[in-house]
Every structure is written in C-alpha cells, then in structure tokens.
C-alpha cells in the first residue's frame, strides 16, 4: 500500500505534465497559423500574383512556419541577442539548406522549371537582420532580382538550344547522307501551297563537296491553283510525283503548254519564264525539281514580274525615269497597273465587292474553272513511249524497266538517251520495290545519286569508309562503316559513287533518283544470278580472297537465284511456312478423331 501511495502522486504529476504539453502544443499551433496569416502578407501576395507557382508540399510549409516563428522572435523586444546567438542561428539555417535541396531533388521531374522558379526566391529570403535591412531598401533590389530571373531563363533557353544543336549535329555525323523531310526550308507558303528547298548537301559533310552546286526544290499546291510566272538563274529538271499539272513555258517568240502526269519529267532551262497550274479538282500537286544554279554555286534566285505580299516585282528595282521611258507612260499609271500601291493594298473602290486579289494571296493563287479551260486549251501531253524529245516532257516509265522481277522494277533514262539532260550529264531513275522486297547490294562506278522517296516506307544500308584522319587515330577499329536510316515519303538520301547500298521495303516503296556525273556510269551488283561482279572472279582469286573454300564460296554465291531484287527475309518466310505446315498436320489428326467419335456416338 505504501508503494501505491508513492506511485499515485507520481502518476497524477505525469498526467498534469502531459496536459500542459498538450496545451502548449495547441498554443504553438495557433501561433503558427497567426504567423502564416498575418506576419507574412508580402509572401502571400507574391504567391497570388505568380500563377506559375505550384502548391507546396507539407514539409516545406512546416519549414517555412518554423522560419517565420524564428523571424518573429527576432522582431520581438528581446532582439538584443548577442552576435554569437545570431551566428548560431545562421549556422542552423545553413544546415537546413542541404536538406531542402535534397527534398527538392526527390520531387517529381514534371514541371521542373516551375518548381525551380518557386524554390529560388525562398533561398534568397533574408536570413539575418543585415539582409533584412537590404531587402527593405526598396524596389531597386526587387527589379535587380527580376532581371536576374530573366537572365537565368535566357541562359536556360540558350543551353536548350545548344543541346538541340548538338543533337542535330550528332545525327548529321552519324549519317551525313540522309536528309529527313524536316530538313527543307520554306521559301513561300500560303493557304494554296508552298515552295521549299532542301539544305545544301555540302553543309553536312565535306564528302559531298561535288554536290555543292545542286539543290532539291519541292513545290506543292492545292487543287485549282496557279504559281505565278517567274524565271530563275538555275537550270531545272522537274518531275511530277503526285497529281496533274499544266506547265506553260514562255520564250521571246512563242509560248508552249504541256500537260504533265505522275512520272512525267521536263527540262526547264535557266532564265525561262514559266508558270505551273494544278487543274485537278480534288488532288494536290507535288513537283520535285533538281536545281543547278548558274551564277553562284549552291544559290539561286526567283524573279517575279508581279508584286505580292511574299516578294516584289523586279520592275520595282528600276528607277522612275527608267520605267516611264520603258513603258512610254506616266509612273502613276505603271504603278497602278503593274506595281500596285506602295502599301500593297488596292483602292477601296476597286476592292469593294471583288474577291481577294493575287497580291494578298501570294505567289500561289486560286484560279477559276474558265481560266483553267483557257490555260489547258492548247496544251500537249508527254511523248509517251520511245526516246524523249528535245523539248517536250517525257515519262520515266515510258520504256521497259532495265531490271524487273516479282519483287520490283528499275527504270532508268541515261544522258545518252535523253537530249534534254545530256549537256547536264544527269540520269533519271525510278525504282519500285514491292512490300517485303530487297534491292540487292550494288554500287555505281562514277555517278552520285540523289534519291527522293516518292511513296511508301522502308530502310536502306549504305557502306562507307572512315576518314583517313580517324583511321590513323583509331587503327584498332574497323575501317568499314554502315550508314542506315528509315525511309518515309519526302525523305532524301545520297548514294556516293563506289559506296555499296541495299534498300528494302516495309511497304510498297517508290523512289526517284537524280544521277550526277552519270555519263558512262556502270551499276555493279554484289549478289544475284546476273550482273554479279563477285561471281566473275576467278576461282583462284576467290580462294585467296575469302576464308572459305572455293566450293563453299561458289555454293554461297549461287544460293541466290534471283537477280537485282529479292525477298528481304527469305529465312523467316521459310520458317513460317514450315511452322504453318506443321501446325496444319498437328491439328488435322485430333479434329479427325473427334469427328469420328462424334459419328460413332450418333450411330
């Protein structure tokens, strides 16, 4: 009992202490709310003004409340603390900073930039009375911080841009012979169509220096549209890849119009004024042109007689006196009829009740049905079968393909058969590879081919040799390098002379090729039953060249019975066929026995 008497007062004392602690916690919680709601209005207003800030986690709010309570104690009359106490307080605050940084790193990466902007001002809050006084100096310091934020954002944008440039540079280094659809630059664009040009070939690598004077131009237009007359300081070889077109070529003494369809090609000499019409009511027009500049290697310019929002008329370049003497009339009349008003708008009385003028539309304009009929009235069609003419259009598939089997077709018009491209030393090829087909490995003896993906998807593998400088530094690595890429419509790739290449189609693939330096070019296949240079080697040379025996080499070479085109996955197809036959045999017996048992039960 004595022990019970001793323990009972102790128990009462402990309960009293617990009660006092609970009351203290409640008071402290109320103080924290008061600090949050009353002592930090500036921070709350800043948060309301900045919509980018996200809701803060609870552990950050508790740390901020603790920091606010410490600041409140600093503002109380008992601020006459010693410098040692302030230094200890600053040390404790500095020790909290690494933990805050770790907690910030543990948060999700989504919205990282907004979180950094939310986190940064907290690290800049005054942590001593000296910093508090500096903060109270006025708006000059806040404007300085704002400029610091802007500089930080600009620096981040520059770093992101540099990272993107480095990634694109690395892609170019991986395969400098491949140009995706996005590598085109837009020259003109409006709601009726666009004109784009591919970046220069020699900007990718010095291995394509011989292509510095060749550019690829693409023209697309919607139905019932016309590209306004112009001439250029470049020779063109244009090919229609989609839709129909009517092109009119204007010379000093005559005008000639031609109707073009898919696969039709035409030589357009430099300085020739021309305009292209899309007469179709439903189908878009797509034309690809190989440009060979005359004045400046790699650069060419289009000259328009009309003024639009995209460009000025070349008549604008002449002086007033020259124009008046040229047209033998007043300048105001010339400006009204040819140049248009200086502000690029028609008079209000002229524009009222009329359709949108061609000056507002740009270089690609809409045309009416009546205008289309007049433009096509005297147009001629392509030459069809046979050798291309000296002036008119010709079709790339007019003759029989030079290579053909069930997996694909290969059409080619060489310079000696094409009077229009003979002086340019350019050949034209059109390749059709059926789905699952493979254009067998081969190389060109002297021609450089620029290939445009007309339709379909696939991939190609190009074999090259490392640079001699790299070979000296990396002698332990192989010299041969494979360049490969996935192909889709609009992509472009280059096949240098002497570089073996193979192309396979994951869907029906159509390719247009421009052969540069194509005169007397020879195509050498490395596999297949025909035109196989490996097959023509002497047996003694085969024995010295390959590690296998002569018999094994001969058997391997003769194993491919197709020529030019073949099945891209013959082994997989054979395996699937075997599994299919095995599956049919395995399923036939159970079904037959089950059917027999069912009949016996019925009988």
Swiss-Prot record:
In the record, which residues are listed under signal peptide? 1-30
Q: What are the protein's UniProt keywords?
A: Allergen, Glycoprotein, Seed storage protein, Signal, Storage protein
Described function: Seed storage protein. Accumulates during seed development and is hydrolyzed after germination to provide a carbon and nitrogen source for the developing seedling.
Q: Which organism is it from?
A: Lupinus angustifolius
Q: Which InterPro entries match?
A: Cupin_1, RmlC-like_jellyroll, RmlC_Cupin_sf, Seed_Storage-Functional
Q: What else is known?
A: The variability of the residues taking part of IgE-binding epitopes might be responsible of the difference in cross-reactivity among legumes.
Task: List where Basic and acidic residues composition bias occurs.
Answer: 36-105, 148-172
Q: From what superkingdom does this record's organism come?
A: Eukaryota
Recorded protein name is Conglutin beta 2
Q: What sequence ranges are listed for the domain Cupin type-1?
A: 177-335, 394-554
Where along the chain is composition biased (Low complexity)? 137-147, 381-393, 564-574
Residues of this chain annotated as glycosylated in UniProt:
504
Q: Which family does it belong to?
A: Belongs to the 7S seed storage protein family.
Please give the subunit comment from the record: Component of globulins complexes which accumulate in seeds.
Q: Which GO terms describe its molecular function?
A: nutrient reservoir activity
Please verify whether the record's keywords include Glycoprotein: yes
Annotated stretches, region: Disordered = 36-177, 343-363, 375-399, 564-583
Entry-linked SUPFAM superfamilies: RmlC-like cupins
The keyword Signal is annotated on this UniProt entry: yes
């Amino acid at each position: 009992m004595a022990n019970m008497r001793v323990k009972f007062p102790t128990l009462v004392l402990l309960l009293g202490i617990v009660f006092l602690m609970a009351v203290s916690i409640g008071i402290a919680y109320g103080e924290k709310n008061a600090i949050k709601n009353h002592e930090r209005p500036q921070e709350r207003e800043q948060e309301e003004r900045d919509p980018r800030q996200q809701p803060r986690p609870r552990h950050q709010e508790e740390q901020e409340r603790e920091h606010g309570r410490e600041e409140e104690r600093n503002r109380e009359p008992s601020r006459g603390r010693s410098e040692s106490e302030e230094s200890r307080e600053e040390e404790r605050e500095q020790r909290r900073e690494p933990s805050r940084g770790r907690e910030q790193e543990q948060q999700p990466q989504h919205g990282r930039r907004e979180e950094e902007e939310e986190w940064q001002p907290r690290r800049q809050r005054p942590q001593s009375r000296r910093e508090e006084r500096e903060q109270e100096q006025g708006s000059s310091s806040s404007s300085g911080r704002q400029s610091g934020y802007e500089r930080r954002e600009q620096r981040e944008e520059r770093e992101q841009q540099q990272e993107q440039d480095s990634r694109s540079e690395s892609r170019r280094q991986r395969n400098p012979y491949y140009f995706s659809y996005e590598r085109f630059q837009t020259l003109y664009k409006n709601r009726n169509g666009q004109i784009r040009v591919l970046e220069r070939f020699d900007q990718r690598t010095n291995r394509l220096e011989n292509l510095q004077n060749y550019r690829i131009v693409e023209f697309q237009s919607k139905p019932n549209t016309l590209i306004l007359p112009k001439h250029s300081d470049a020779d063109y070889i244009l090919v229609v890849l989609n839709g129909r077109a009517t092109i009119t070529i204007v010379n000093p003494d005559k005008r000639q119009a031609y109707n073009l369809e898919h696969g039709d090609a035409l030589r357009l000499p430099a300085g020739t004024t021309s305009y292209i019409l899309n007469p179709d009511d439903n189908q878009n027009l797509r034309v690809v042109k190989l440009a060979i500049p005359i004045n400046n290697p790699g650069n060419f310019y289009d000259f328009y007689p009309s003024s639009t929002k995209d460009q000025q008329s070349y008549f604008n370049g002449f002086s007033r006196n020259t124009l008046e003497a040229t047209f033998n009339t007043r300048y105001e009349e010339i400006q009204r009829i040819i140049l248009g008003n200086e502000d690029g708008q028609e008079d209000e009385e002229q524009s009222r009740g009329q359709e949108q003028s061609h000056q507002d539309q740009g270089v690609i304009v809409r045309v009416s049905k009546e205008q289309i009929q007049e433009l096509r009235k005297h147009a001629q069609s392509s030459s069809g079968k046979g050798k291309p003419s000296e002036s008119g259009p010709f079709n790339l598939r007019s003759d029989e393909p030079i290579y053909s089997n069930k997996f694909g077709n290969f059409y080619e018009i060489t310079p000696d058969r094409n009077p229009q491209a003979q002086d340019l030393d350019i050949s034209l090829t059109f390749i059709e590879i059926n789905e699952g087909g493979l254009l067998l490995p081969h190389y060109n003896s002297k021609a450089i081919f620029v290939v445009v993906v007309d339709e379909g998807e696939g991939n190609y593998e190009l074999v090259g040799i490392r640079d001699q400088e790299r070979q000296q530094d990396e002698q332990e690595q192989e010299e041969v390098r494979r360049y490969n890429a996935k192909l889709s419509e609009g992509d472009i790739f280059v096949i240098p002379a002497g570089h073996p290449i193979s192309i396979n189609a994951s869907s029906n693939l159509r390719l247009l090729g421009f052969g540069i330096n194509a005169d007397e070019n020879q195509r050498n296949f490395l596999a297949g039953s025909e035109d196989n240079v490996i097959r023509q080697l002497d047996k003694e040379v085969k024995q010295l060249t390959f590690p296998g025996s002569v018999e094994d080499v001969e058997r391997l070479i003769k194993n491919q019975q197709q020529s030019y085109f073949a099945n891209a996955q013959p082994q997989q197809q054979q395996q699937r066929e075997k599994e299919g036959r095995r599956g049919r045999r395995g399923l036939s017996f159970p079904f037959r026995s089950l059917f027999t048992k069912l009949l016996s039960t019925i009988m």
